[in-house]
Swiss-Prot record:
Subunit organization: Homodimer.
Localization terms from the record: Cytoplasm
The entry's keywords: Aminoacyl-tRNA synthetase, ATP-binding, Cytoplasm, Ligase, Metal-binding, Nucleotide-binding, Protein biosynthesis, RNA-binding, tRNA-binding, Zinc
Record's keyword annotation contains Nucleotide-binding: yes
Name of this protein: Threonine--tRNA ligase
Region (Catalytic): 243-534
Coiled coil regions, renumbered to chain: none
UniProt source species: Enterobacter sp. (strain 638)
Length: 642
């Protein structure tokens, strides 16, 4: 007679084993109709799974994040159902949930076209609209294998042979005549799976191994209702308009080419943005009392063997040879910073020592994963490492957190999700050390009133970490900032200081990045601002233009005055209509356009327009310059009412 405890603390007693659906029905028919699955003692289960003992139960509906994820997973099965009806010889591989959707890898004897995808989506809708029940059966490993052997599903057989224990009872989900295998849970009925869209096709190797067959990956998105689906599609459309690759070309910021895959060719305007970001970061380094250093971009392989990078990371490292020595081009900056720390005897009085670098790093990312500025092989990190005593960790982490929020707020990022990753099973250091380290990170977050969630067991083997994920205006997540404790690297590279007891001590090392890759951060900002960079970041901040040749000297004089005030300015003296010039510079997202006609020459003023089309009228030149300098100096996100 199980007693079921609900989230509000109320209890219901039953005289038999019950499923989450039974409990929902006992509460009311409305809840039963909305039930997708259950969470029993913290574990997600199907709505039909039986609960035999006392348990805590939460009913999962489409209002829950888990409910949406289950809908997406079931839409992957729906895709399988439809594709087997259209092309019965298709072999099904894997169909997991991903952010905002799902995919299915399929082995098909022809290359899918857009017409095929349209037909597939249509068949999926036809099937879903019959609102058939999804039937789950847990069977023996042997029965599952026999089922898929009979159906010719060699990829499912391979999964059973290589990934599932013979003692397990795999879940087989029956979608009418179609059968799929999954841990689940899945929707109990296809009425939950009406709001989806197939998005694109890509290639994917079976098990991610290029030695295996290339499969076709069909991507889709699915939501709880039509409104949410349409809102997502609108966001995608907006994201396409904001694509940094498209805007980067339009604004002549950078380019990439085949001869240097994953490496950026910065053009003048893009490099201006890059240098402005460096200047901004440097101002914060000074404020938070960091040294700035510069390490070599390659070091002997022997050093990387000492650090452990060679054993764990060599596939991602570029190497070169000279005079019978092998060198690794650095994928990260930390070993170099330890070498700088090791020069000269250090005392506890020298700590904390905060060391920052705009470190040029290279990683051998797979060519298929490269994506504009977001995923590159050559990048610059705003990297820092803090060497401190165990007793200083909390204060240093506290300062790092303040610095992270200080810098992100400058760009207008307000929604930041924070996760604290704790000790994994395989780790170095004592439990006492980990207890203190994890507590230091948690307390530092709490002292800054920052809500966070734990990622249990997700820390590195050498220490716990805090991850900062910022959300942009389209609610996309970008993991940028990290504060990572490291108990290993200083020990591996013999870093030490003399403690108060005159004994040799090993410092704690804190890895700290805020923007992460500057290249990637510029990509994020380009999409966040849709190319309308705040004035302080804009490559060209002001364009001064004449209406006729008679104002040319006045334009030159005004341009020089703006340059002398430290403003990035260009003069446009072309023999073109003023409307043409304004349109062109508006498309180039120049924050301010100053127009000079005869009236402005006579009055010593200038007509001011913003890139958003706002006419601010004819204003005193010195007032305009002072207001612009204030806007730039304060790194304002808003254009001032000059």
């Amino acid at each position: 007679m199980p007693v079921i405890t609900l989230p509000d603390g109320s209890q219901r007693q039953f005289d038999r084993a019950v499923s989450p659906m039974d409990v929902a029905l006992d509460i009311g028919p409305g809840l039963a109709k909305a039930t997708i699955a259950g969470r029993v003692n913290g574990e997600l289960v199907d709505a039909s799974d039986l609960i035999e003992n006392d348990a805590q139960l939460s009913i999962i509906t489409a209002k829950d994040a888990e409910g949406i994820e289950i809908i997406r997973h079931s839409c992957a099965h729906l895709l399988g159902h439809a594709i087997k009806q259209l092309w019965p010889n298709t072999k099904m591989a894997i169909g997991p949930v991903i952010d905002n959707g799902f995919y299915y890898d399929v082995d098909l004897d022809h290359t899918l076209t857009q017409e095929d995808i349209d037909a597939l989506e249509k068949r999926m809708h036809e099937l879903a609209e019959t609102n058939y029940d999804v039937i789950k059966k847990n069977v023996s490993w042997h029965e599952a294998r026999e089922t898929f052997v009979k159906r010719g599903e060699n990829y499912k057989v391979s999964i059973l042979d290589e990934n599932i224990s013979h003692d397990d009872k795999p879940g087989l989900y029956h979608h009418e005549e179609y059968v799929d295998m999954c841990r689940g849970p899945h929707v109990p009925n296809m009425r939950f799976c009406h709001h989806f869209k197939l998005m694109k096709i890509a290639g994917a190797y079976w098990r991610g191994d290029s030695n295996n067959k290339m499969l076709q990956r069909i991507y889709g998105t699915a939501w709880a209702d039509k409104k949410a689906l349409n809102a997502y599609l609108v966001r995608l459309e907006e994201a396409a308009k904001r694509d940094h690759r498209k805007i980067g070309k339009q604004l002549d910021l950078y380019h990439m080419q085949e001869e240097a895959p994953g490496m950026v060719f910065w053009h003048n305007d893009g490099w201006t943005i890059f240098r402005e970001l460096e200047t901004f970061v440097r101002s914060k380094l000074k404020e938070y009392q960091y040294q700035e250093v510069k390490g070599p971009f390659m070091m002997d392989r022997v050093l990387w063997e000492k650090t452990g990078h060679w054993d764990n990371y060599k596939d991602a490292m570029f190497t070169t040879s000279s005079e019978n020595r092998e060198y690794c081009i650095k994928p990260m900056n930390c070993p170099g910073h330890v070498q700088i720390f090791n020069q000269g005897l250090k005392s506890y009085r020298d700590l904390p020592l905060r060391m920052a670098e705009f470190g040029s790093c290279h990683r051998n990312e797979p060519s298929g994963a490269l994506h504009g500025l977001m995923r590159v092989r050559g990048f610059t990190q705003d990297d820092a490492h803090i060497f401190c005593t165990e007793g200083q960790v909390r204060d240093e982490v506290n300062a790092c957190i303040r610095m992270v929020y200080d810098m992100y707020s400058t760009f207008g990022f307000e929604k930041i999700v924070v996760k604290l990753s704790t000790r994994p099973e395989k780790r170095i250091g004592s439990d006492e050390t980990w207890d203190r380290a994890e507590a230091d990170l948690a307390v530092a977050l709490e002292e800054n009133n920052i809500p966070f969630e734990y990622q249990l067991g997700e820390g590195a083997f050498y220490g716990p970490k805090i991850e900062f994920t910022l959300y942009d205006c389209l609610d996309r997540a970008w993991q940028c900032g990290t504060v990572q404790l490291d108990f290993s690297l200083p020990q591996r590279l013999s870093a030490s200081y003399v403690g108060e007891d005159n004994e040799r001590q090993i410092p704690v090392m804190i890895h700290r990045a805020i923007l992460g890759s500057i290249e990637r951060f510029i990509g994020i900002l380009t999409e966040e601002f849709a190319g309308f960079f705040p004035t302080w970041l804009a490559p060209v901040q002001v364009v001064v233009m004449n209406i006729t040749d008679s104002q040319a000297d006045y334009v030159k004089e005004l341009t020089q005055k703006l340059q002398n005030a430290g403003i990035r300015v260009k003069a446009d003296l072309r023999n073109e209509k003023i409307g043409f010039k304004i349109r062109e510079h508006t498309l180039r997202r120049v924050p301010y356009m100053l127009v000079c006609g005869d009236k402005e020459v006579e009055s010593g003023k200038v007509a001011v327009r913003t890139r958003r089309g706002k006419d601010l009228g004819s204003l005193d030149v010195n007032e305009v310059i002072e207001k612009l300098r204030l806007e730039i100096r304060s790194r304002s996100l808003q254009q001032l009412e000059v």
